[in-house]
């Protein structure tokens, strides 16, 4: 009896042990699925997963097409530093460069082509910093200044000519005076001729009435009565006329 009970007890304890072990194994197998079924908040990622996610994000954001602009911005830092200093980017020509450019301009060069600009830039680079655009704009500005200078000279010459004509030949006061004086002279000439004709006719009539047609009349063009009186006195002194007796009767 005791052996049977022991065997029964052992078998029951073994069965319990097997059931507990099977339950523990089943729980271990179902343990990873427990958080999903329970709906509990997910556990924070481990350090290794965080590193991998961080590296993945960097690879996504840093791309080959974006590396170019970053390098370009890095290269543009020196010009930005130059802009902080006023006049840093401007071309400051030397005396030698200006002298050579003026010599070329006086020689007849006005609009150099690309090859000429490149050659001039190469030669002038020996005397200081210079670029091709500096050479091009120098010629353009020099031509513009020369055109403005010519316009100023033309305006000055025109103003001088206009002032000379207004004060000299084409002065309205002078022209009016000359016109009035010339018109008066023209009007006086026929009047003088008429007076001379009248005087000559009067002298001829008097001479004919006195019988001296061949008498030379002096000072026919004199207009004053005094000259007429002197001529009459000469005539009377030279010839005694019966019309004017020296001793009239009745006195």
From Swiss-Prot:
GO biological-process terms attached to the record: cell division; phloem or xylem histogenesis; procambium histogenesis; signal transduction
Name the source's superkingdom: Eukaryota
| A GO cellular-component term linked to this record | nucleus
Result of knocking out the encoding gene: No visible phenotype under normal growth conditions. The double mutants wox4 and wox14 exhibit reductions in vascular cell division.
Q: Where is the composition biased (Low complexity)?
A: 11-21
Key words of the record? Developmental protein, DNA-binding, Homeobox, Nucleus, Transcription, Transcription regulation
Residues the UniProt record assigns to the DNA-binding region sit at: 86-150
Q: Where is this region: Disordered?
A: 1-21, 33-93
Which tissues carry this protein? Expressed in the vasculature of the whole plant (roots, hypocotyls, cotyledons and leaves), trichomes and stomata. Expresse in the developing vascular bundles of root and shoot lateral organs.
**Protein purpose:** Promotes differentiation and/or maintenance of the vascular procambium, the initial cells of the developing vasculature. Part of the TDIF-TDR-WOX4 signaling pathway that plays a crucial role in the maintenance of the vascular meristem organization during secondary growth. Is required for promoting the proliferation of procambial/cambial stem cells but not for repressing their commitment to xylem differentiation in response to the TDIF signal.
Name of protein? WUSCHEL-related homeobox 4
